[in-house]
């Protein structure tokens, strides 16, 4: 008896989805690039044609979420607008315009035995993607999976059941129009947690599980899956403001604008600023850096030294507690910590970083040391951490931002959804 046999009434449905996804993956595996491009263009067209229905379904989800008293960041991630849906359609078209990694040949060589070997890039197979209140993920995953030759089984949160159903209908319409199996992308519409549990254990059909959500979701997937899990999307984002970056009024303005963007442009995003580390040599500029945050409604929680520097300029902020460092806020909250220089900043980030970490500096040596020493999925110099995003890094879209080192790290675009196989050709050689 398998573990999933203990879930009566669940296994047959989800197992059937897995079997159908596996059959669809065989079709997608050898699909020419042109067919995949046409399917994505058809999907973008369906999203535009079905705008009213999709937004109406999403409005139902938003209304239910607000009535249930869900936190504002969760509702924010759930909400779609006409502009957001148009952007999602453009993202699909952007994926269609990307180079297709499938079939790429590498490491071609002829060995002394006369055999000719190479590695060929191939799809992973069937992806299981589990996420919370982000309906855009449904389309992002569909587009990336199709373009990379993978099938996908999606399990969104119960908050998105109506939105995801409408989006799945659009995806299936596009696939049917192009003569491709609709089973290439399937959404588990039943919000019962048992459905998710079985997906995690569907190792006979699913090749990888990719969770997108909070730490609790990632932990649940890792602890319960028999399918390999790619963990990511959670982590504390740091910016270290070096003293060399506040030597001119212009640089102070740049730092203030960048830090404000990092925190307020989309505070519910996983790549939004959580902790600002300020070099003691930069404390004189701190009021000019923090004032725009306060004006934007950010609650700043600072250590005593930073508090004193701000109080001297008439700015009052909350006292930071130990738990405020190492916390992913996903809201208009940021912690602030004074450090004695780069060494202390690196030690601090080493204990709490891993997602996206930024240095603001005019010292090239400091910048290079930061890039070399910080062990995170993305390390940035003089740029907002909000750029750690598949679309912003030229991937078109992303399934997730992986913070682990196997199988992929950072935003997972097309290439990260493939693996390789060895191709060996010969003329009848046998091994001695």
UniProtKB/Swiss-Prot annotation:
Look up the record and name the pathway of this protein. Amino-acid biosynthesis; L-proline biosynthesis; L-glutamate 5-semialdehyde from L-glutamate: step 2/2
Q: Report the EC code(s) recorded for this entry.
A: 1.2.1.41
What SUPFAM superfamilies would the database entry show?
ALDH-like
Xref: InterPro entries: Ald_DH/histidinol_DH, Ald_DH_C, Ald_DH_N, Aldehyde_DH_dom, G-glutamylP_reductase_CS, Glu-5-SA_DH, GPR_dom
Q: Where are the transmembrane segments?
A: none
Could you give one GO CC term from the UniProt record?
A: cytoplasm
Protein's GO biological process: L-proline biosynthetic process
Cross-referenced PROSITE patterns: PROA
Reactions accelerated catalytically: L-glutamate 5-semialdehyde + phosphate + NADP(+) = L-glutamyl 5-phosphate + NADPH + H(+)
Where does it localize? Answer: Cytoplasm
Q: Which GO terms describe its molecular function?
A: glutamate-5-semialdehyde dehydrogenase activity; NADP binding
| Pfam families linked to this entry | Aldedh
Keywords for the protein's UniProt record, in alphabetical order: Amino-acid biosynthesis, Cytoplasm, NADP, Oxidoreductase, Proline biosynthesis
Q: What does this protein do?
A: Catalyzes the NADPH-dependent reduction of L-glutamate 5-phosphate into L-glutamate 5-semialdehyde and phosphate. The product spontaneously undergoes cyclization to form 1-pyrroline-5-carboxylate.
* Family per similarity comment: Belongs to the gamma-glutamyl phosphate reductase family.
Under the heading PANTHER family, the entry gives: DELTA-1-PYRROLINE-5-CARBOXYLATE SYNTHASE (PTHR11063:SF8), GLUTAMATE SEMIALDEHYDE DEHYDROGENASE (PTHR11063)
Task: List, alphabetically, the HAMAP family matched.
Answer: ProA (MF_00412)
Annotated protein name in UniProt: Gamma-glutamyl phosphate reductase
Q: Give the organism, scientific name.
A: Deinococcus radiodurans (strain ATCC 13939 / DSM 20539 / JCM 16871 / CCUG 27074 / LMG 4051 / NBRC 15346 / NCIMB 9279 / VKM B-1422 / R1)
């Amino acid at each position: 008896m398998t573990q999933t046999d203990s879930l009566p009434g669940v296994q047959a449905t989800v197992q059937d989805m897995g079997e159908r996804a596996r059959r669809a993956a065989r079709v997608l595996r050898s699909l020419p690039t042109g067919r995949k491009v046409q399917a994505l263009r058809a999907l973008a067209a369906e999203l535009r044609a079905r705008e009213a229905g999709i937004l109406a379904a999403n409005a139902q989800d938003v209304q239910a979420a607000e009535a249930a008293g869900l936190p504002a960041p969760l509702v924010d991630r759930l909400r779609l607008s006409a502009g957001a849906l148009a952007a999602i359609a453009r993202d699909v078209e952007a994926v269609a315009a990307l180079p297709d990694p499938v079939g790429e040949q590498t490491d071609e060589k002829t060995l002394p035995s006369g055999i000719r070997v190479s590695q060929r890039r191939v799809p992973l197979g069937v992806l299981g993607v589990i996420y919370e209140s982000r309906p855009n993920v449904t389309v992002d995953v569909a587009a990336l999976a199709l373009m990379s030759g993978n099938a996908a089984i999606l399990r969104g949160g119960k908050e998105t059941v109506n939105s995801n159903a409408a989006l799945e209908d659009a995806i299936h319409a596009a696939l049917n129009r192009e003569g491709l199996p609709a089973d290439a992308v399937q959404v588990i519409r039943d919000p019962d947690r048992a459905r998710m549990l079985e997906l995690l254990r569907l190792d006979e059909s699913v090749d990888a599980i990719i969770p997108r959500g909070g730490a609790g979701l990632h932990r649940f997937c890792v602890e319960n899956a028999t399918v390999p899990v790619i963990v990511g999307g959670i982590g504390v984002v740091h910016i270290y403001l070096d003293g060399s970056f506040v030597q001119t009024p212009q640089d102070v303005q740049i730092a203030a604008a960048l830090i404000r963007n990092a925190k307020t442009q989309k505070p519910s995003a996983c790549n939004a600023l959580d902790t600002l580390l300020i070099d003691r040599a930069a404390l004189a500029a701190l009021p000019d850096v923090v004032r725009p945050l306060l004006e934007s409604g950010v609650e700043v929680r600072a250590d005593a030294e930073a508090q004193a520097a701000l109080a001297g300029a008439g700015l009052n902020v909350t006292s930071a507690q130990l738990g405020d460092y190492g916390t992913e806020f996903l809201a208009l909250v940021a912690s602030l910590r004074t450090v004695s220089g780069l060494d202390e900043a690196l030690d601090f980030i080493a204990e709490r970083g891993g997602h996206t970490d930024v240095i603001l500096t005019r010292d090239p040596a400091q910048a290079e040391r930061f890039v070399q020493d910080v062990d995170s999925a993305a390390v940035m110099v003089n740029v907002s951490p909000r750029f750690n995003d598949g679309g912003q890094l030229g991937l078109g879209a992303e399934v997730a931002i992986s913070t682990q080192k196997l199988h992929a790290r950072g935003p997972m675009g097309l290439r990260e959804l493939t693996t390789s196989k060895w191709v060996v050709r010969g003329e009848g050689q046998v091994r001695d």
